[in-house]
Amino acid sequence: MTTRALDTANENPEQSGSWSGVLAIAVCAFALVASEFLPVSLLTPIANDLGTTEGMAGQGIAISGAFAVLTSLFISSVAGSLNRKTLLLGLTAAMGMSGAIVALAPNYFVYMLGRALIGIVIGGFWSMSAATAMRLVPANDVPRALALVNGGNALATVVAAPLGAWLGTLIGWRGAFLCLVPVALVALAWQWTTLPSMRAGARAPGPGNVFTVFALLKRPGVMLGMLASSLFFMGQFSLFTYVRPFLETVTGVHGAHVSLVLLVIGAAGFIGTLLIDRVLQRRFFQTLVAIPLLMALIALVLTVLGGWPAIVVVLLGLWGLTGTSAPVGWWAWIARVFPEDAEAGGGLFVAVVQLSIALGSTLGGLLFDRTGYQATFFASAAMLLIAAFLTILTARSKAPAG
């Protein structure tokens, strides 16, 4: 949906909506992020129960990322003919179905089917969530609405992994996934009662399909920036996906202590998202370069000092502080280089991020199973270093700076 269509929708009184509707979308965002990364905290019991390796269990994140890529690229053509409320309700229902399928999966194949379904929801929801929030409130309240929706995302990054690990020890990994179903049902009922009917607006000329979205890559500096962000997320998730087995097999952390370490990562990440805006305002590209450099250093140090629990907790806290806040910077970059096509650029960025998560978690899993954690962490560091170099090239390119 184009900016012109959104402006028309915002001017339509019957689509003014309510803050309750925005809150409903925020709850949906929380459940979705929790669903996406819940396997990170439950890889070991999932692998043991399904009779597979931890690396193969980690492919549940890879497949969700792959399907999110496809959905984010093609959702605009589908959304153009569907009422936005209907589409959101359908995606929310599918999220609940995914949690149930994974929780009841009798084998690895069904587990992967459930993860593929959540990938479809991820791609569809994030590609249209901002545009939908913009239709629910007056124009001057849009920033607050978007912050509220992203607040659900930020909250999930804090509590999802440690809560998942704790629930896994309490009621098993299947019970942890099953807990997502009532949350999805609450979000579904909330959206059903609070969201107004949101008819698809007239499609204005511009990047409205997958082919013209790819044309954005021809703009100066855009390809470099997308490659830099892609390698950043690949490096991040090739390591982060396998934090739990690393903690258990190398650091010697088990049970509830795993939950505490994951809570440290999430809490540090939440703090990072609160602080990053000020840092970006002062030194934008310097910050985007420094983050992957620091994370690469952390990955390398973990290969040497991974057996020291106190040091590992501090290092992973720094990893969460920097890694969770980095997407804020890259979204700000999107706004800079696509001032007139922010929605199309955002859709392309969603595809890049999800593809990178899929590739990173896949590569990390293959290395973890075949050669051990050190190869995984070395690969992560290498990708992060290349990301930093490409970010420097992006800063020196002729991309618009807003």
Curated annotation (Swiss-Prot):
| Transmembrane intervals | 22-42, 60-80, 86-106, 108-128, 147-167, 170-190, 220-240, 256-276, 296-316, 318-338, 348-368, 375-395
- Keyword Disulfide bond appears in the UniProt entry: no
Keyword Glycoprotein tagged: no
Q: Taxonomically, which superkingdom?
A: Bacteria
Which GO CC terms are listed, alphabetically?
plasma membrane
Looking up Pfam families in the UniProt record yields:
MFS_1
Task: Write the protein's name.
Answer: Transcription regulatory protein OpdE
Q: Which subcellular locations apply to this protein?
A: Cell membrane
Gene symbol of the encoding locus:
opdE
Q: What membrane topology is annotated for this entry? A: Multi-pass membrane protein
Q: Which GO terms describe its molecular function?
A: transmembrane transporter activity
Q: What does this protein do?
A: Regulates the expression of oprD which encodes the imipenem-specific porin.
Biological process annotations from GO? transmembrane transport
Give the family per the record. Answer: To B.subtilis YwfA.
Q: Which UniProt keywords apply?
A: Cell membrane, Membrane, Transcription, Transcription regulation, Transmembrane, Transmembrane helix
Chief site of localization: membrane
PROSITE patterns in the record, alphabetically?
A: MFS
